[in-house]
Amino acid sequence: MARFRGSITKVSRRLGVALSPKAEKYLEKRPYAPGEHGQSRRGKVSEYALQLREKQKMKYLYGVLEKQFRNYYKKAVSQRGITGDNLVKLLERRFDNVVFRAGFSPSRAGARQLVTHGHLLINGKKVDIPSYLLKPGDAMEFRQKSQNLDAVADSMNRAPDSRIPSWIQVDKAHKKAVFLAVPEREEVQEPFNEQLVVELYSK
């Protein structure tokens, strides 16, 4: 499965948003773009550049490559409601994102690894596809043989409980969670403007 393999810290500095816990620490020390002239870059940013930057933020935050991201956009357009809201809701329903939101991993990249390595079940069945879209009422849990793995315990211990949203019910003691509902747009606190992405794709 294709995924981004470059430096997420450099991308975070370029976009001005932390895309991982490690990148968050770097941004605190160096809150400017990488490179020799990172601190001195000035000038008016074009509308297209702003739109492109917001798209990049969304793609990197959710760990989605261009082709798949565009497919999410097309699906969002075909649904009723506000296209931007629909796009965010689709991304929030991704299996790897829900694992991250539930506090089973400190990062979406880590959550993606847990999923692809087959550690988790959805409604009692193994699902190893990060892009699988959960529905309200879907229950996820770690496989029995994965319950006591050091990697799983470490992943959960490093994920802050304070981040768990109201639309996911979590039982950390038993390593289980239920996806209660698709969140409304205002419930998703992420540093991007999806409307600019809609404007970019609708040209």
UniProtKB/Swiss-Prot annotation:
Family the UniProt entry places it in:
Belongs to the universal ribosomal protein uS4 family.
Query: Would the keyword Cell membrane be found if you checked this record's keyword annotation?
Result: no
This chain's function reads: One of the primary rRNA binding proteins, it binds directly to 16S rRNA where it nucleates assembly of the body of the 30S subunit.
Name the CDD domains for this protein: S4
Which biological processes are named by the entry's GO terms?
Answer: ribosomal small subunit biogenesis; translation
Stored SMART domains: Ribosomal_S4 (SM01390), S4 (SM00363)
Domain named S4 RNA-binding: residues: 93-153
The protein's name is Small ribosomal subunit protein uS4
**From what organism does this protein derive?**
Chlorobium phaeobacteroides (strain BS1)
Q: Provide the organism lineage as a comma list.
A: Bacteria, Pseudomonadati, Chlorobiota, Chlorobiia, Chlorobiales
Q: Which PROSITE patterns match?
A: S4
Keywords, ordered alphabetically: Ribonucleoprotein, Ribosomal protein, RNA-binding, rRNA-binding
Cross-referenced HAMAP family? Ribosomal_uS4_B
Q: Name one GO cellular component term.
A: small ribosomal subunit
Claim: DNA-binding is one of the keywords in the record: no
List all membrane-crossing ranges.
Answer: none
The subunit structure is:
Part of the 30S ribosomal subunit. Contacts protein S5. The interaction surface between S4 and S5 is involved in control of translational fidelity.
